[in-house]
């Protein structure tokens, strides 16, 4: 079994606590946490848990397992961490953990990576102009990525991710929509083993434009793109009004619902089942999954 790498995200947030708590019953011998060992020790003391750290020299070092056991591939903090107090001086540390995990996955040393929540504002204040894991990993892997959140009932993909609302329309083009749909279609086949994925696309505007009265994006961009994708053999319907896209019959019929922007899709799936929803990045040559909550 290939190794699974975990990054804890923002050191002053809940990520280190989750890493410690995971060691009590979920971590197995093939799981490695990439972090500063002192961070895990600090967290264990804070939440009153006993842990045993196995600090690795490299990815091929011998691993241990058992309650409280954590295999740690060390990356040193830039500055001492204070729980609950975000510090941009540790932004570089956060970036290093993500980069290391991604590179080890790219090189085949690990089968996938699980990421803890980051503070995007702290990273930017620390000099790293990134808007999120999804975009950063796409840059590392030199490819386009698509954010998808899923649980047992729903798979919701986003065409745009961390983009201000007044800028979203700039990203709604025939080419970009086509790229997003093709990534979803490919990964549903290859990673989820769905032979003929069915995708439902929402419109951008209220009522999916209402025949152009409430916006032209649907008639000028989305509808022609859907027709072209259908002609290429991709099973996609839409655009449909976002307010009815998540009716039970649609959730049952379609494998994925593609929304145009962040807050068009995420509130639905988080309301449905926040605790069991995970974030998966499609389009990457590696496997990356994440929690769907913030740094707390």
Please report, for each region that a protein language model flagged, where it lies by residue.
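Contiguous, glycine/small-aliphatic-enriched amphipathic segments in soluble metabolic enzymes
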Residues: 1-132, 175-260, 264-279, 283-293
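Active-site glycine-rich loop that binds ribose-phosphate moieties when present
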Residues: 135-143, 163-189
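Flexible loop/hinge segments that line or gate small-molecule binding clefts
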Residues: 128-164, 286
């Amino acid at each position: 079994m290939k190794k699974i790498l975990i990054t804890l995200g923002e050191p002053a947030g809940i990520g280190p606590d989750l890493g410690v708590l995971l060691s009590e019953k979920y971590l197995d011998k093939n799981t490695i946490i990439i972090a500063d060992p002192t961070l895990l020790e600090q967290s264990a003391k804070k939440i009153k848990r006993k842990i045993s750290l196995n600090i690795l020299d490299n990815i091929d070092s011998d691993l241990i397992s058992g309650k409280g056991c954590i295999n740690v591939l060390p990356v040193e903090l830039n500055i001492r961490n204070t729980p609950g107090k975000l510090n941009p001086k540790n932004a570089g540390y956060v970036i290093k953990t993500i980069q290391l995990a991604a590179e080890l996955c790219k090189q085949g040393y690990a089968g996938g990576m699980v990421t803890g929540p980051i503070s995007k504002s702290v990273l930017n204040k620390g000099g790293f102009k990134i808007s999120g894991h999804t975009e950063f990993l796409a840059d590392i892997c030199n490819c386009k990525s698509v954010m998808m959140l899923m649980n047992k009932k729903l798979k919701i993909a986003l065409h745009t991710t961390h983009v201000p609302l007044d800028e979203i329309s700039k990203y709604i083009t025939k080419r970009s929509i086509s790229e997003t749909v093709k990534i979803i279609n490919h990964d549903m086949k290859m990673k989820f083993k769905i032979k003929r994925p069915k995708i439902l696309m929402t419109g951008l505007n209220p009522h999916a434009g209402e025949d152009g009265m409430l916006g032209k994006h649907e008639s000028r961009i989305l509808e022609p793109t859907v027709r072209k994708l259908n002609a290429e053999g991709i099973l996609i319907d839409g655009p449909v009004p976002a307010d009815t896209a998540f009716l039970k019959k649609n959730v049952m019929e379609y494998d994925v619902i593609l929304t145009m922007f962040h807050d068009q899709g995420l509130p639905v799936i988080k309301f449905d089942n926040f605790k069991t929803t995970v974030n998966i990045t499609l389009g990457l040559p590696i496997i990356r999954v994440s929690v769907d909550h913030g740094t707390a």
